[in-house]
């Protein structure tokens, strides 16, 4: 249901991250789904993520359903500025100019309380907590209806953990995800 938050708890290695990859239709061999389905209902439309083409899955991801993987702060390209990574991401899903993508990014990062200086930084110039917040912003900038987040505070100190959790709460309030 819209605006609700759920948690999945379990011992290390019990399959929590694997479950999230299946829910995102992002599983890869040798992992296979023997039977069942992953159905999403958006308005009057129902889709089964396990029976979609690659293009349909690509269209679903990030616009409708988003995923922040475990250790996500390492998914940023180390040799590209944050601004460029946002531009590429937005432009791969929306028909906008680089300038429009940059403006959209700047506005969104500001709304999330991230400083403008982040835009021109390389990932290694940011703290672990800031990289995590940037990654969450990247996963949510297209306003997905559903967001999966896998251990968003791993390897962060307590103060930074609190900031990341608050960021996720703020996104939920702003977007209704």
State what each model feature region is:
Residues 9-11:
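The feature captures the beta-strand-to-loop junction immediately N-terminal to the Walker
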Residues 41, 99-117, 169:
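Conserved ABC ATPase "signature" region
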Residues 44-66, 84, 92:
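ABC ATPase NBD coupling module
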Residues 147-150:
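Catalytic Walker B motif of ABC-type/P-loop ATPase nucleotide-binding domains
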Residues 162-176:
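Helical segment within the ABC ATPase nucleotide-binding domain
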